[in-house]
Amino acid sequence: MYSSNIKTIRACNGMLFVFYYSQGSIFFVKIHKGSSSASVKIADNASPMFSVWCTDNGIYIMFNGDQGTVLCFYNYSRWVSRIIAKDLGESCSRISFFTDGESVHLLYSIKNINSNTESLFIRSMKKDKWEQPKKVSDIMPFPNTPYFIGRENNDKIKIYYRISDKTIKYRSLNLCDGNMTEAENLLATSMPCYDISILTKNDESHILYLAQGMYSSQLIYKGIKSGRQIKARVIWEGQLSGSCLLFCNNGRLYALMYLSLIHI
C-alpha cells in the first residue's frame, strides 16, 4: 500500500497505471508501449490520501470521501465502487488492505475518545458480500504506528499489537477464509518503548525492542521459531537513544541500531 497522492502500479499484463489526486478528485492514466491514454476520473469528493492495490483480477483503490470510506475496483475494463464504512473518518489512525482470490480484508485502528488507546478491527468481504467488523483487540499504539503486519506466506499474515499493560501480542489471519488464531504473547516489558522493529519470515517472528528507562536504555531481542518461544535477552545497554532495525541477509539475522548521545 502507498500513502502519497500520486502513485504507479504495473499490472500483470505489463501496462503501467498512474494514479493521482487533483482538486478533490482521483484520476488515472494508462501507459503502454510508450503511449499514454487521456486522464480518466475515478472519483469526486475524495481525500488527498488514497491507497492502491493490484491483483491478478484487477486494481483496487481505497479512499475517504464525503459519504465515508470508498473501495473502487477496476477489472481492466470498467470501474465499480461501493461505500464500505461510513463511520471511520478522522478517528481511523491507520487502515490496511489485503486480498486473496475472492476475499478482501480491511484491518483498521479506531481512536478511542478521551483515551490513549485504540480499537483494532478486521472486516472481510467474501464473494462481494461484506461481513460485520470483528474486533481484534483494544490496543496501545506504538510510537509511530498502531500496529505492525508481517507476512507468513501467500495466504497468512501476522498482526502485531500492544495492549494497555505494554505486552506485545500477535494473531495470525488466514486471508483465504478470514479466520484468526487466538492471541499469543510475544514480549512483555515495563520500560517505555522508544523504537521497535519486527520481522516475519515464514513461521518465524523476530522482535527488536529499544526500551528507554530513566537512567539507561536496553535493546531487547526475542524470537519465535516453529511455535517455540526463544527467551528474551538484552543485547545492548547504555545511556544512549536512537532507532533500531532487524533485517535478514543470506539466511542470517542482523540487528542495526542508530545511536544518538543523550546529554544529561
PLM-predicted stretches and their roles:
Residues 1-262:
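Extracellular, repeat-based ectodomains that mediate carbohydrate processing or recognition
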